Regions:
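C-terminal-most transmembrane helix of multi-pass membrane proteins
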Residues: 2-24, 28, 33, 62-66, ...
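Transmembrane alpha-helices of multi-pass small-molecule transport proteins
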Residues: 2-7, 11-15, 41, 51-97, ...
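Hydrophobic alpha-helical transmembrane segments of multi-pass membrane transport proteins
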Residues: 36-44, 48, 88-109, 128-129, ...
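Transmembrane alpha-helical segments that form core, pore/gating elements
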Residues: 47, 70-73, 126-127, 132, ...
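Membrane-interface helix-cap regions at the ends of transmembrane helices
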Residues: 48-51, 55, 68-83, 150-164, ...
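Hydrophobic/aromatic residues within transmembrane alpha-helices
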Residues: 52, 61, 105, 132-134, ...
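Specific alpha-helical transmembrane segments that line the substrate/conduction pathway
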Residues: 60-70, 103-146, 175, 261-280
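Hydrophobic transmembrane alpha-helices of multi-pass small-molecule transport proteins
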Residues: 67, 73, 128-129, 138-158, ...
Length: 329
């Protein structure tokens, strides 16, 4: 049986479908800059969080953060066209679970730098949830990137000190699980304005946080701290509400609605790099060689995850052109 020989130029279409599928997982350059800006703010925010819990109770700060996220923005942005149950799930996952646990953890149970590291387990949790719930596929280069990043995180994790407790690590892991769960809810909220989505979801964050603060921290303690609240702490809370929450989570959810979770979530692995850099610059934290080495591994992982599809596609196209030239000769 004689097989048809492809015409010259047809080989360019071989594997084109798979290449296009791979490129769907690659962020455009403007979107890359947006998400880098978001993770940079998140990283530096760990320093602000630590400064805040040194002045106010952690659950009280969390409630105030999301209260100022909700008000006054909720009066100016329309409700997103998404089910109330989706907003409920996102609001509880991000507001209560992630940040409720995270603020408690950085209040003397774990250092800000290590917290910025451990919470990145949300990347693995997000990808695992995507595989199970959405049947998303992970490419070989994405898996390799995760392994590199895990090595970098392991190096940092092996250099803990007496300022970190198992309870702090456990609470931060629960926070990471809350973040990953929030990623799943925002992933399902396709075609909505993510700014309004983030704002309206805090309707379900504030009430439980206020109740938890009243129960665990007490009305008298809350009243005493509010009476002595200074303008620096107040501005810090506003920044966490408007900059870190509305701006950054709006970007994060907006990109998750357009790209696979396996492409967006690994960018959060840069948060410890920004967090440690901000801590070194603002708090005088030292940066020994092991921290620099770990940061390099994380950056290498991000480069592989970001440019892996482009590199593979370029290699395939080059191989196809070489075969065409060989057949032509």
């Amino acid at each position: 049986m004689i097989k048809a020989v492809p015409k010259q130029g047809e080989l360019n279409t071989i594997g084109l479908h798979s290449d296009l599928e791979a490129l769907k997982s690659v962020l455009s350059y403007p979107h890359m800059l947006l998400i880098l800006c978001a993770v940079g703010i998140w990283g530096a925010n760990f320093v602000i969080m630590k400064n805040s819990v040194d002045v106010l109770p952690p659950l009280m700060i969390t409630a105030m953060r999301f209260l100022f996220t909700l008000v006054p923005a909720v009066f100016f942005v329309p409700k997103p066209k998404v089910r109330w149950t989706n907003l409920l799930g996102y609001g509880l996952s991000i507001g209560v679970v992630q940040f409720g646990c995270l603020y408690i953890a950085v209040d003397g149970l774990i250092t800000p730098g290590l917290a910025s590291l451990v919470v990145q387990m949300q990347v693995l949790f997000t990808i695992a949830m995507s595989i199970y719930l959405n049947s998303e596929r992970i490419t070989a280069y994405q898996l390799s990137a995760l392994i590199l990043a895990a090595l970098g995180l392991l190096i940092i994790g092996l250099h803990t000190d007496n300022q970190t407790s198992l309870m702090g690590v456990a609470l931060t892991l629960v926070a990471a699980l809350g973040w990953a769960s929030g990623n799943m809810f925002s992933k399902r909220a396709t075609g909505v304005n993510m700014l309004s989505y983030v704002v309206w979801s805090t309707l379900f964050s504030v009430p439980p946080l206020v109740c938890l603060s009243l129960y665990f921290e007490g009305l008298q303690t809350i009243a005493e701290h509010l009476s002595t609240l200074n303008w620096q702490t107040f501005i810090g809370i506003l920044w966490q509400a408007w900059g870190s929450t509305i701006f950054c989570y709006g970007i994060w959810g907006w990109l998750l609605a357009r790209y696979s979770a396996a492409s967006v979530a690994p960018f959060a692995l840069l948060i410890p790099v920004f967090g440690m850099g901000a801590s070194a610059f603002l708090l005088g934290e030292s940066l020994p060689l092991w921290k620099v080495g770990a940061a390099m591994l994380v950056i290498a992982a991000m480069l592989l995850n970001t440019f892996g599809a482009r590199f593979r596609s370029a290699l395939r196209n080059r191989g196809a052109r070489l075969r065409e030239l060989k057949d032509a000769n």
